[in-house]
Amino acid sequence: MKRLAQLLLPGALILLPIKGVQAEPPEDPIYVKTSDGWNAAYAHGDEYAGFRVIGNGAKLQDAYHILLQKGVGMMVSFVDKKELQNDGDLLSAHAQWEIDYWHQRASKVESNTREDLTGTRKDVKVTEIKVYNDKGTRISSYLIGLAAKDGVFVLSVSPAQKDVDPLVKELVSSFKLVPRNLDAEETKRLSSEAKAQR
């Protein structure tokens, strides 16, 4: 039986799902409080994605949803490569998978790859998506994809607008794949790093 436990470590709060006493990686993202936001880690198999949410105004809604600042939210997810039906370019396959999803549900979908937000990195892709309903109402988001062995870690930031670009760049610069298990020892290491940043 899973339960969400809050473990208080010296100077840090970690949200960590506990499964009995087994030493399995957590299924949900974990967050470690820092002096200027949160360090996050989301495990899948024997690797995890790490990223930073900068800003003391950032508020965790649950393990998968974060209010980054007033009017700007983020969702954290993982898409298995089996869903993408393309083993070659996982990042492009993921972007197309998202676009196809919205084409089935919206009147109009526009997408644009935002290389200006990723810099020279090839392991990350930012796709800006605008979705319109039949009344012309628009929702927009940035999909930040990080290629992994078994799929794509995704940070979805909404709304997509020019004044959110610097925030997306910060997320991209911190979004890294770590080829280690997110076990108790690694979690302790992350907590110690966060404490040192305080």
Task: Briefly describe each language-model feature range.
Residues 1, 87, 164-168:
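Alpha-helix N-cap/helix-start motif
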Residues 1, 120, 124, 189-197:
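Charge-rich, low-complexity amphipathic helices
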Residues 1-8:
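Bacterial N-terminal signal peptides that target proteins for export
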Residues 4, 17-20, 31, 96, ...:
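Generic N-terminal leader/processing signal
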Residues 14, 20-73, 114, 137, ...:
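N-terminal targeting sequences that direct proteins away from the cytosol to non-cytosolic compartments
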Residues 60-147:
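Conserved polar/disulfide-associated segments of primarily extracytoplasmic proteins
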